[in-house]
Amino acid sequence: MKVVEIKHPMVKHKLGLMRALAISTQEFRRLTKEITSLLTYEVTAGFELEKTEILGWQGENIEVDQIKGKKLTVVPILRAGLGMMDGVFEHVPAAKVSMVGMYRDENTAKPVAYFAKLCDKLDERVALIVDPMLATGGSMIETVTLLKKAGSKDIKIITLVSAPEGIEALANAHPDVELYTASIDSHLNEKKYIIPGLGDAGDKIFGTK
């Protein structure tokens, strides 16, 4: 599995701000969007270009570069993934949205699916899954499995922080996906939370406890 940890200074700086205990909901939400935007820029760096003819500003036909045949659906894992969508839309405003509801049972740490609304022609689209945390990998593995069953063939993932345990589990289950993350953190604690992590990203994005 391709794993890319984005080590750009702006990404690391913004992520460092997000780790603070006293961070406000507004600030956490803003930084989530900004980091997602920077990571999306990295994800799309591998997209192929082709020449297209357009009518230029002087009224004459000119050749310009355009992304070649790429259709994209952004797939937020509810609910925390919703906070990352605007960061993707800054670069791909026409992206279709496919939503997957997946939560982690706090007692068993196992994923539980409760919702899926996917766009059409998944076999023709890049599916970009967004979720702030890759902890055990369970929810992400189930989401990828769901997308593949629906026809997805090209799946990329953006997370803010990832645990080594989750990366290993995801790689074993789906070695053909690509993971882009702002940080590979140290480990999972006994409650399966990422250390040092961000705490509960969903609660911090939506201002709930």
From Swiss-Prot:
Cofactor(s) needed for function: Mg(2+)
Entry keyword Protein biosynthesis: no
Binding site for 5-phospho-alpha-D-ribose 1-diphosphate: R79, R104, D131, P132, M133, L134, A135, T136, G137, G138, S139, D200
Superkingdom of this protein's organism: Bacteria
GO biological process, one term: UMP salvage
Catalytic activity: UMP + diphosphate = 5-phospho-alpha-D-ribose 1-diphosphate + uracil
Keywords, ordered alphabetically: Allosteric enzyme, Glycosyltransferase, GTP-binding, Magnesium, Nucleotide-binding, Transferase
One annotated GO molecular function: GTP binding
UniProt cross-references to Gene3D superfamilies, sorted A to Z: 3.40.50.2020
Activity regulation (UniProt): Allosterically activated by GTP.
EC number: 2.4.2.9
Binding site for uracil: I194, G199, D200, A201
Cofactor descriptive note: Binds 1 Mg(2+) ion per subunit. The magnesium is bound as Mg-PRPP.
Pathway(s) per entry: Pyrimidine metabolism; UMP biosynthesis via salvage pathway; UMP from uracil: step 1/1
NCBIfam families for this protein: PRK00129.1, upp
Protein family membership: Belongs to the UPRTase family.
Function: Catalyzes the conversion of uracil and 5-phospho-alpha-D-ribose 1-diphosphate (PRPP) to UMP and diphosphate.
Protein's UniProt name: Uracil phosphoribosyltransferase
